[in-house]
């Protein structure tokens, strides 16, 4: 069996890394879109090393989980994450949707561009997922031995995982890019 915990909410560097990996955005493009989202009141300040969420943000994330995914995906108490960077700039909390209730990505104002919408969706999903239950499943291994005339036995091994409870992965797939994530949901 395996248990997989969600990643913490975004810091500046993790947002840039994930936007590059999932959205193919350069760091400058990510920060431009984040700046616009911040200036329009959709996200918190985007220059931070902190992974902590305020109590208000934890409550908003839990409300999002209950509404979008169901109470069975919500842990008994909010998750907390410690910042690993020494001398971290923790005056600001993690990058997250702003406000007492997180705006759904479909409800962003019409004047937000495509980059802003994509980046906000990434932030919204990661913040929600950071407060969801662990994903759980089983590891499987299959080995096949085949006899060959010239080289003796040949051994083939395949490993994989099955999912018993998707947990946070319903909201945010960490190890796949967007096209793989969409295929996984289908």
Label each region the model flagged:
Residues 1-35, 39, 70-71, 86, ...:
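Long, highly charged, low-complexity internal segments
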Residues 25-89, 95:
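Extended, well-ordered alpha-helical scaffold/bundle regions in very large, multi-domain proteins
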Residues 97-100:
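GHKL/Bergerat-fold ATPase module in large chromosome/replication-associated machines
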